[in-house]
């Protein structure tokens, strides 16, 4: 149906992740397709997938295809317009339009902002070197898998659940892995000190080296990452450095549009 003659309101969804698509699934169950013409804009060049299972892809237990939640056919069958690999860069509330990185402009009647979060990055030198990545999306996992095939030594910065999953996955892929954690024990937000120590001993027996009480001062290297320098003088050689120190909500787009934000969109 032509957009200009479609009597339904246009619902634009910014974000093609789990939260946004779960909302659309529920809307469709309530006959939302009769009321709304739905368009989804995603920054990643992929359909919706289960981000939680990226660690299983890294470890070799699943493929990327196996963690897809909504296939291209699902979008088509439900009459959903999908734009991937083209992040929304601005919301114009006055004229009810959005603009994407490629310059595309789309009008809306209703707007759902489901932009998720992004990895935290410590303010240290060397973050931009080749061989440094986060552990947040498919592109990050692809970088890590390539490194595992061509390089030998990995350093993971962050001793929470995500960092441990990254370390274990890279170990399963045959890399020598060291993990740097700022705190004295692992997963201190979930485990007490004795439990964190037990976990560390178990993973140490499995071949992962640990540098606790480790404040990262610099990622060294000239043309690519070569190692991690800690503030106390310890140095860890590395061909790959993975940042896994947490996430923060993607609120910039909403804030720039004049919406109330705090630690998320209010």
What is the role of each PLM region?
Residues 1-12, 69-155, 229-231, 242-244, ...:
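FAD-binding core/adjacent interface of flavoenzyme oxidoreductases
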Residues 15-20, 116, 158-163, 233, ...:
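Conserved phosphate-binding and hydrolysis motifs of nucleotide-dependent enzymes
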Residues 20, 51, 55, 68, ...:
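A general structural signal for well-ordered alpha-helical segments in protein cores
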Residues 55-59, 130, 151, 155, ...:
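Short, hinge-like loop/turn segments at secondary-structure boundaries
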Residues 143-191, 225:
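Rossmann-like NAD(P)H-binding beta-loop-alpha module
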Residues 2-81, 169-191:
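Beta1-alpha1 glycine-rich phosphate/pyrophosphate-binding loop at the start
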Residues 37, 82-99, 106, 173-265:
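A Rossmann-like FAD-binding core segment of flavoenzymes
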Residues 18-21, 45, 117-119, 139, ...:
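Residue-level detector of alpha-helix initiation sites
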């Amino acid at each position: 149906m032509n957009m200009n003659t479609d009597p339904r309101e246009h619902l634009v969804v910014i974000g093609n992740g789990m939260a946004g698509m779960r909302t659309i699934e529920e809307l469709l169950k309530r006959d939302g397709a009769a009321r709304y013409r739905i368009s989804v804009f995603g920054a990643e060049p992929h359909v919706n997938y289960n981000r939680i299972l990226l660690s299983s892809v890294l470890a070799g237990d699943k493929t990327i295809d196996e963690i897809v939640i909504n296939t291209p056919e699902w979008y088509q069958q439900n009459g959903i317009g999908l734009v991937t690999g083209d992040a929304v860069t601005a919301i114009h509330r006055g004229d009810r339009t959005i603009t994407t990185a490629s310059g595309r402009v789309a009008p809306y009647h209703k707007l759902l902002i489901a932009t998720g979060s992004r990895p935290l990055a410590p303010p240290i030198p060397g973050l931009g070197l080749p061989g440094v990545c986060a552990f947040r999306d498919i592109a990050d996992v692809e970088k890590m898998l390539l490194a595992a095939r061509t390089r030998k030594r990995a350093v993971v910065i962050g001793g929470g659940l995500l960092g441990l999953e990254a370390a274990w996955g890279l170990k399963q892929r045959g890399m020598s892995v060291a993990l740097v954690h700022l705190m004295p024990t692992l997963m201190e937000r979930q485990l007490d000190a004795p439990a964190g120590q037990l976990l560390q001993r178990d993973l140490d027996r499995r071949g992962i080296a640990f540098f606790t009480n480790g404040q990262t001062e610099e990622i060294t290297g000239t043309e690519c990452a070569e190692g991690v320098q800690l503030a106390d003088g310890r140095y860890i050689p590395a061909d790959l450095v993975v940042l896994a120190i947490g996430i923060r909500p993607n609120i910039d787009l909403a804030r720039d549009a004049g919406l109330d934000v705090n630690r998320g969109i209010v």
